[in-house]
């Protein structure tokens, strides 16, 4: 069967002009004009999509099939062009019957033209074919316009859906034109309104926690210099006090007086429930005289190392991708979970604005991965925000997954971020030594976002930077009062 592209070539119909007219009409539609005025940053992103629209329309016209009736009429026209005038006179009755049978727009005019002339001359033969060709061009142009109109309606519907999605998420995720462009690209997925409302919800929560948002921005902007030791540098002795585990970490070896609520003896806690002794409990708490378990597990010793006296130069580290590990244990539920998800959303915003990648790993008993900056970033973000934190804590697996990711070339300059309350078992020695090697040799940076004031110091010492956001009730009330 004849294709529309072939018909356009045969009749010299300019499809490019029709496509350009359709795109201009689409961009000038009232819906897009209002949207561009409201979200000017997304205008450039949508305009960048025009070449893709143009190519899709060309492909649609190229693959479209011509109706059988029009195909048969075109074939008859081509055969008629090869006839001499005497042959044309002989074939004319069959041609007129064919045009009538096919309900051709040219059929009635053709019969009137023949009836108006008593003799078929060479000039009439040429005029007949010229007018027939014009009729075919009109039919081909109409067919092109019908197909383009169908595509325009479909394209306008798609653009309106993406505009609705992008317009909702632009205040949350788009910080500049780069972010707006990437957000528009990610809006091409099949998403429903109820899906992306989850991102809007956490975006509103993030706006209610300006300290958390500011913390994410500080982490995103943090940049250190790489110091490169000289090969011939003189060495000097450097002494420092280090804390290290002694015997069994956190082993109970007696009782002591302190204000450590987490290690409180049950009899002391019982006095809190007695009205007459409640003030006495608070007095002893303030004076650190409550009976608590004494733990044995850490000691200090002097460590002597040698290091170069001078350094050759400093290379500023580029801002690489984010590898974010989120603790999904039960202790991270509730408000901690909301803060962790909102913090990741803030990092996603930074990654989109600075053309970086943002890779999320959820760790508990197993590791689940999401890439929030890829083509399916919005869908991945929705799946991540839909997760519930009810697992256990396996920090060792988290660090092993990070180190495995850092070995690949595309993630070599990534920043590793661990979001947790850091109430967990101590890390194995092999994991600790590997992390220190990455920090020392490859200058990788490990960030900790601590959601609790009770995180274990033995775990947190491994990080280059510790960003604290205490989610305890007292800290939350203080932050609200300061606002």
Swiss-Prot record:
Function, as annotated: Component of the RavA-ViaA chaperone complex, which may act on the membrane to optimize the function of some of the respiratory chains. ViaA stimulates the ATPase activity of RavA.
Annotated SUPFAM superfamilies: vWA-like
Entries under Pfam families matching the protein: VWA_CoxE
Oligomer and partners: Homodimer. Interacts with RavA.
Residues in the signal sequence: none
SMART domains: VWA
Protein name: Regulatory protein ViaA
Compartments in which it is found: Cytoplasm
InterPro entries the UniProt entry points to: Uncharacterised_CoxE, Uncharacterised_ViaA, VWF_A, vWFA_dom_sf
Keywords: Chaperone, Cytoplasm
UniProt keyword annotation of Cytoplasm present: yes
A GO-annotated cellular component: cytosol
Sequence similarity: Belongs to the ViaA family.
């Amino acid at each position: 069967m004849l294709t529309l592209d072939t018909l356009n070539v045969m009749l010299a119909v300019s499809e490019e002009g029709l496509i350009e007219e359709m795109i201009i009409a689409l961009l000038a539609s009232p819906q897009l004009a209002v949207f561009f005025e409201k979200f000017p940053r997304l205008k450039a992103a949508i305009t960048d999509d025009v070449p893709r629209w143009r190519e899709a329309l060309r492909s649609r016209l190229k693959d479209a099939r011509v109706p059988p009736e029009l195909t048969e009429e075109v074939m008859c026209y081509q055969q008629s062009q090869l006839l001499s005038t005497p042959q044309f006179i002989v074939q004319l009755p069959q041609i007129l019957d064919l045009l009538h049978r096919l309900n051709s727009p040219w059929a009635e005019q053709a019969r009137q033209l023949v009836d108006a002339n008593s003799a078929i001359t060479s000039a009439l033969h040429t005029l007949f074919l010229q007018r027939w060709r014009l009729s075919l061009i009109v039919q081909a142009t109409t067919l092109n316009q019908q197909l383009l109109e169908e595509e325009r309606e479909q394209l306008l519907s798609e653009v309106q859906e993406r505009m609705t999605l992008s317009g909702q998420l632009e205040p949350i995720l788009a910080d500049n034109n780069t972010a707006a462009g990437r957000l528009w690209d990610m809006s091409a997925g099949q998403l429903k309104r109820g899906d992306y409302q989850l991102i809007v919800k956490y975006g509103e929560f993030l706006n209610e926690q300006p300290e958390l948002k500011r913390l994410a921005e500080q982490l995103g902007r943090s940049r250190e210099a790489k110091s490169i030791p000289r090969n011939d540098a003189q060495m000097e002795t450097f002494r420092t006090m280090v804390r290290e585990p002694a015997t069994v970490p956190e082993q109970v070896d007696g009782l002591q007086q302190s204000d450590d609520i987490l290690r409180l003896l049950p009899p002391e806690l019982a006095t809190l429930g007695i009205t007459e002794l409640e003030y006495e409990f608070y007095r002893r708490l303030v004076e650190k005289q409550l009976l608590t378990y004494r733990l044995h597990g850490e000691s200090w010793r002097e460590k002597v190392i040698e290091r170069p006296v001078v350094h050759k130069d400093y290379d500023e580290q580029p801002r690489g991708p984010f590898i974010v590990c989120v603790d999904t244990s039960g202790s991270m539920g509730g408000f901690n979970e909301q803060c962790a998800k909102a913090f990741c959303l803030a990092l996603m915003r930074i990654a989109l604005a600075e053309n970086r990648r943002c890779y999320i790993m959820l760790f508990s008993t197993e590791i689940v991965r999401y890439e929030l900056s890829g083509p399916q970033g919005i869908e991945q973000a929705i799946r991540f925000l839909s997760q519930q934190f009810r697992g256990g804590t396996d920090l060792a697996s988290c660090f092993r997954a990070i180190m495995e990711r850092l070995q690949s070339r595309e993630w070599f300059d990534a920043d590793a971020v661990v979001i947790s309350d850091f109430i967990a078992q101590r890390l194995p020695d092999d994991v600790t030594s590997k992390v220190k090697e990455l920090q020392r040799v490859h200058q990788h940076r490990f960030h900790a976002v601590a959601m609790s004031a009770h995180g274990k110091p033995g775990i947190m010492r491994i990080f280059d930077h510790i960003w604290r956001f205490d989610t305890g009730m007292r800290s939350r009330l203080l932050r609200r009062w300061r606002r």
